[in-house]
Amino acid sequence: MELAKKIGFNLKQARKDKGLTQKQVAYKFKMTQQQYSRFENGVFELNYQQIIQLCELFEITPNDLFLVD
């Protein structure tokens, strides 16, 4: 699995673990649900600032996003 898709998968799991919807997360980051969905689907890659902000929101570390099974 390519890295962007794996990060997206881990992002989705972290969001679900927090009980949040894509729409709720997108609202916090001032983007549409469709835009946020592209991160979870590995279509768009996250920049450093986005990674840090999402990790803070989901209470995970950047390493958690990059873990590959």
What positions do the PLM features span?
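DNA major-groove recognition helix of helix-turn-helix/homeodomain DNA-binding modules
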Residues: 49-64
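Short, conserved catalytic or interaction motifs in soluble domains
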Residues: 41
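Short amphipathic recognition helices of helix-turn-helix/homeodomain-type DNA-binding modules
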Residues: 65-69
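Short alpha-helical DNA-recognition segment
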Residues: 19-38
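A short, Lys/Arg-rich alpha-helix, primarily the initiator
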Residues: 1-17
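Alpha-helical residues within the helix-turn-helix
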Residues: 16, 27, 56
